[in-house]
Amino acid sequence: MALSLPPRPALLFLVLMSVTLMASAFPQPQLRPLQSNLPAIGQEDSKGEQWEVVYPSISLRDWSIQMLTAPDFGAAKTGREQLVADDWLPLSQSQMEEELVKGWTGDWPSRVGHQQKRNIVVADDAAFREKSKLLTAMERQKWLNSYMQKLLVVNSK
C-alpha cells in the first residue's frame, strides 16, 4: 500500500527527511558524558567537584590553518624616504571636505544663473560618488549633510 498524504503534509515530510539526511551526513561530535564525582545529598566531599571538559567537534584542531609568508619590504627606509605617519593615515572628515572643496571649483567657464549652479551640482555629485567609494556609510552621510548645508547657505545669498 502506497503512502498517500495530502500535498502539504507530504511536502513537510519530505523536507524533514531531507534535513535529517543532510544533518546526518556531517561528522557527528564524539561527545563524552560529563562525569561528576558528587557525593550523595547531605554528604560532604573534601575533594570538591571535578568536571571533565567536553570539546565540540568544531574546534581549532579541525581547521587547517595556513600561515601566509610576510611580504618583503626590503631594507628599512631611512631619512626623508621613510613614511611619515600623516602620509598613510586616513583623512579626517574636515580634511576630506577641504580636499573636495578644492577640487570642486576647477576651471569651469562661468555661465548664467541656474545653468552654472546645475553644473556645480553635477560635478559635485560625480566627485561625491568617486570619493564615496572610499568612505563608510556614516562618513558618506556626514559629508552629504555638510554639503547640503553649504548648498543652502550659497543659495540663500
Curated annotation (Swiss-Prot):
> Where, subcellularly, is it found?
Secreted
An example Gene Ontology cellular component term from the record? extracellular region
- Indicate the secretion signal residues: 1-25
**InterPro entries per UniProt:** TIP39
Report the domain of life of the source organism.
Eukaryota
Q: Which residues form the propeptide?
A: 26-116
Summarize the record's induction comment.
Up-regulated in the developing brain by shh signaling.
GO molecular function, a single term: receptor ligand activity
Sorted UniProt keywords:
Cleavage on pair of basic residues, Neuropeptide, Secreted, Signal
Q: One GO biological process from the UniProt record?
A: swimming behavior
What family does the database annotate? Answer: Belongs to the parathyroid hormone family.
Q: What does this protein do?
A: Plays a role as a potent and selective agonist of pth2r resulting in adenyl cyclase activation and intracellular calcium level elevation.
Q: What is this protein called?
A: Tuberoinfundibular peptide of 39 residues
Q: Provide the species name.
A: Danio rerio (Zebrafish)
